[in-house]
Curated annotation (Swiss-Prot):
The lineage of its organism: Eukaryota, Metazoa, Chordata, Craniata, Vertebrata. This is Proliferation-associated protein 2G4. Residues 2-48, 301-394 are annotated as: Necessary for nucleolar localization. The modification Phosphoserine is found at residues 2, 335, 361. GO terms for biological process: negative regulation of apoptotic process; negative regulation of DNA-templated transcription; positive regulation of cell differentiation; regulation of translation; rRNA processing.
Amino acid sequence: MSGEDEQQEQTIAEDLVVTKYKMGGDIANRVLRSLVEASSSGVSVLSLCEKGDAMIMEETGKIFKKEKEMKKGIAFPTSISVNNCVCHFSPLKSDQDYILKEGDLVKIDLGVHVDGFIANVAHTFVIGVAQGSQVTGRKADVIKAAHLCAEAALRLVKPGNQNTQVTEAWNKVAHSFNCTPIEGMLSHQLKQHVIDGEKTIIQNPTDQQKKDHEKAEFEVHEVYAVDVLVSSGEGKAKDAGQRTTIYKRDPSKQYGLKMKTSRAFFSEVERRFDAMPFTLRAFEDEKKARMGVVECAKHELLQPFNVLYEKEGEFVAQFKFTVLLMPNGPMRITSGPFEPDLYKSEMEVQDAELKALLQSSASRKTQKKKKKKASKTAENATSGETLEENGAGD
């Protein structure tokens, strides 16, 4: 099957492909909102991750029912990373759970695919902000910085622009809030069945990464998952020894697995997930999955998504959206329920050029979106408001 796919790559030049992306985006947005609503003090992260994944499977099960062969479901397992945890925290039943508490800064990250067309989204918020009160201090700084980085990217990721322009804007926005983008993190181009396409945008690269990172120009009919991670600290993410639970198959690697458990595990991975990221939680026998993954990862048949941490006491905020580069402007298909008025920072973007960029109209795109998709008028309206408020407030 994959041979044919490679010859005939389907892009958003086809209406049906756009429809599949938008259906995945709608589901991702709905699941995200329902998880944000369910997040409160005393709630377990494991239970929320399970709820998110179950909801993605349930919702994708309701569409394209007649197409029995079509694969659809989770494109990135629900991960909920709190405070200084940067990303990929998605515990197994056998791992230590985390219970949310008042004041926690929470990042929810998930992805949905319909026929291999991927819609990723991530959102940050704070637990238990009372009606009429505001989040202040470093949490507010880092959330505002990350959100404005995402808004800048929405205006910069368009045909003719370079990936380096986005990287530079992110550094400037983050620094104006005395924050730092997480070093070396990548946003990827998306293609059918491919979550890590070749064109990327790098955050806060080291000198070496700057040299090595491919410069690229955005082109019409491309799709990107734009992923912003900003820290109140130095922006260095480290593996703190937490068990990795999310992996994806690397189709370019081959190896003859020796252990029976590993072989059984790997063939289930191929059958159920193809090259999409998956969680070990999705296996009926978690213990066997934990054993089977070891040999597969050791020989690089599977790539790990390690759980990363910033220094204790710092905060990391994340916003991720998926954008289709349509001929009439970028179309954002995923976003979270961001409420700018909840976050009060003493700092703001000073750079005149950036200010102008952030205030530049995203409503033109919204209008074009409205023509494209009447069904999402409500969401366009909300994203439109956020953009206008941003323009006015910053």
